[in-house]
């Protein structure tokens, strides 16, 4: 296949999240691959022939066999900690079980968080260029792509994922680096706090497989209270709503205040001993750090992105908290797509389908001549 033919092929877009990997072809509305960013290895000794031939599984395969596996997540707080596992995940994306294509036949768009670790970026580029032999590569910021997916060029994006939350103001397509805020708080902290609450209730869910069960409980049962204190008082007096969850062994867990106290850590991180700011305060700081002439525009163009913002009641609580600290004069408007779990991927899909995307690509030849070129081209 010639270089021209390769560049005529659909680019591939990969969004590397701490919680989930999203991957697919440019121009598509939804990612073809959507699976947990995890790897599982057999933790028991094989004593007889079995239909399970492999010792390692990726993503949903690992989740389906989690009782037999030790589950590990290679990305922690936006930084890749286990490179061999992450490389297995990237290789799996191109396999016949997922995209069923060859990496050397498609240009690639990779998303990255703001304030990305430089060493991380170097190693990612090295793997894709030198091991997978991708012909060309471009990096783009996740919040910028999320704004792109909302059909805007100006606004402020709150990107709340599994391990990190960013608030990034963008004006006319340009991010404002001095106003970017990052906090090490996200969906994983909600899961951890829920796990602690369940332990206090007598439910010991401590193994890596059981941690995934806690994550499922969070997604099915948890919600954000519109007023945390009032919700506590109401539940104490009337016990208005009790949730149940059936474990794989058919035991039933009964959940009360845990359903709304766990997500509360996103707005009050001090509950779990963290010094991070609540998400509403984080975004408020970003707006205050932006130029005074831009603030009213940013207040009226807030875009929620990331899977953790899908918690029931999140948007209502967020806008209520932000209005309380920003003052009545500011017109606060929030835009929250139902598909915001993969907003960044969708923005990347749109960007990579444009004819102008070629100008953003760094070819393998350019990379071979100067590896630092990946730091000089920005979206």
From Swiss-Prot:
Location in or out of the cell: Cytoplasm, Cytoskeleton
User: Cytoplasm as a keyword?
Assistant: yes
Top-rank taxon of the source lineage equals: Eukaryota
Note the SUPFAM superfamilies from the entry.
Actin-like ATPase domain (SSF53067)
Alphabetized, the UniProt keywords read: Cytoplasm, Cytoskeleton, Dynein, Microtubule
Q: Does the keyword Translocase apply?
A: no
Provide a GO CC annotation, any one. Answer: cytosol
| Alphabetical list of InterPro entries matching this protein | Actin (IPR004000), ATPase_NBD (IPR043129)
Task: Cite the record's note on assembly.
Answer: Self-associates to form an actin-like filament of 8-10 monomers. Component of the dynactin complex.
Q: What is its biological role?
A: Core component of the dynactin complex which assists cytoplasmic dynein by increasing its processivity and by regulation of its cargo binding. The dynactin complex is required for the spindle translocation late in anaphase and is involved in a cell wall synthesis checkpoint. Arp1 forms the backbone filament of the dynactin rod structure and serves as the scaffold for the remaining subunits. Required for proper orientation of the mitotic spindle.
Q: Provide the protein name.
A: Centractin
The organism is Schizosaccharomyces pombe (strain 972 / ATCC 24843)
**Which lineage ranks, top first, belong to the organism behind this chain?**
Eukaryota, Fungi, Dikarya, Ascomycota, Taphrinomycotina
Q: Which gene encodes it?
A: arp1
């Amino acid at each position: 296949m010639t270089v021209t033919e390769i560049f005529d092929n659909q680019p591939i877009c990969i969004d590397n999240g701490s919680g989930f990997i999203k991957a697919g072809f440019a121009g598509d509305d939804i990612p073809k691959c959507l699976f947990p960013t995890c790897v599982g290895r057999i933790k028991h000794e094989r004593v007889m022939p079995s239909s399970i031939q492999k010792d390692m599984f990726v993503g949903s395969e690992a989740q389906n066999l989690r009782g037999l596996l030790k589950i590990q997540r290679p990305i922690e707080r936006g930084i890749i900690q286990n490179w061999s596992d992450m490389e297995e995940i990237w290789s799996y994306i191109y396999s016949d079980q997922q995209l069923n294509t060859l990496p050397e036949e498609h240009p690639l768009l990779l998303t990255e968080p703001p304030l990305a670790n430089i060493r991380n970026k170097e190693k990612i580029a090295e793997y894709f260029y030198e091991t997978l032999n991708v012909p060309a590569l471009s990096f783009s910021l996740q919040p910028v792509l999320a704004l792109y997916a909302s059909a805007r060029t100006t606004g402020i994006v709150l990107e709340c994922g599994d391990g990190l939350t960013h608030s990034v103001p963008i004006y006319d397509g340009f991010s404002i680096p001095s106003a970017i805020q990052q906090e090490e708080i996200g969906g994983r902290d909600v899961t951890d706090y829920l796990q602690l609450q369940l332990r206090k209730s007598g439910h010991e869910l401590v193994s890596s497989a059981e941690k995934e069960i806690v994550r499922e409980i969070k997604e099915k049962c948890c919600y954000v209270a519109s007023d945390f204190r009032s919700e506590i008082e109401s539940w104490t007096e009337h016990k208005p709503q009790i949730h149940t969850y059936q474990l794989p062994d058919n035991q039933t867990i009964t959940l009360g205040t845990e359903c709304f106290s766990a997500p509360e850590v996103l707005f009050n991180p001090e509950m779990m001993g963290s010094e991070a700011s609540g998400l509403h305060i984080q975004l408020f700081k970003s707006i205050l750090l932006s130029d005074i002439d831009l603030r009213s525009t940013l207040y009226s163009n807030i875009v929620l992105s990331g899977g953790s913002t899908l918690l029931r009641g999140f948007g209502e609580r967020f806008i209520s908290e932000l209005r309380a600290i920003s003052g009545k004069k500011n017109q606060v408007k929030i835009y929250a797509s139902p598909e915001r779990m993969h907003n960044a991927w969708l923005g990347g899909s749109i960007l990579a389908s444009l004819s102008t995307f070629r100008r953003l690509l760094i070819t393998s030849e350019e990379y071979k001549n100067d590896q630092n070129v990946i730091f000089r081209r920005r979206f």
